Amino acid sequence: MPSFKLANYLRTHRKRLGLSQDEVTFLLGRQSTALVSVHEQFRRLPCLRTLLAYTVILQIPAHELFAGEYQKVEQVVSRRAKRLIERLATENPDQRTARKLAHLRTIVATPGTRV
């Protein structure tokens, strides 16, 4: 059974660095700390630009900041990759299909250890 991950670690890393919500809000170019609070409480996912800004500010990769969400997405993609492997296995085994299958098998093989 996979270990449980928190939905996100924004607050953990922000506090570890000694940054206030107000300071992170300023670095994000926002006016109100409400957005940072909403993200820390995982009531809403940040947009891509804000996610990238968090990675710059906190110096932590996105998959670590949002470990729980990453884990969920990884599991879903792994299940889909298994289904795609089954579909592709019925095709002619040309070089292109072989490359696809090899890549898909790496997705399925070790969920939780990639990145």
Predicted segment positions?
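Recognition helix of helix-turn-helix/homeodomain-like DNA-binding domains
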Residues: 29-46
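Short basic helix-loop element that most often maps to the first helix and adjoining turn
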Residues: 8-27, 78-89
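A short, Lys/Arg-rich alpha-helix, primarily the initiator
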Residues: 1-16, 103-107
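Helix-turn-helix DNA-binding elements, focusing on the entry/boundary residues of the two helices
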Residues: 10, 21, 33, 48-51
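Short, charged recognition helix plus adjacent turn
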Residues: 56, 66-115
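Short, basic-rich loop-to-helix N-cap that marks the start of a DNA-contacting helix
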Residues: 18, 42-56, 72
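Residues in the recognition helix of alpha-helical DNA-binding motifs
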Residues: 13, 27, 38-39, 68
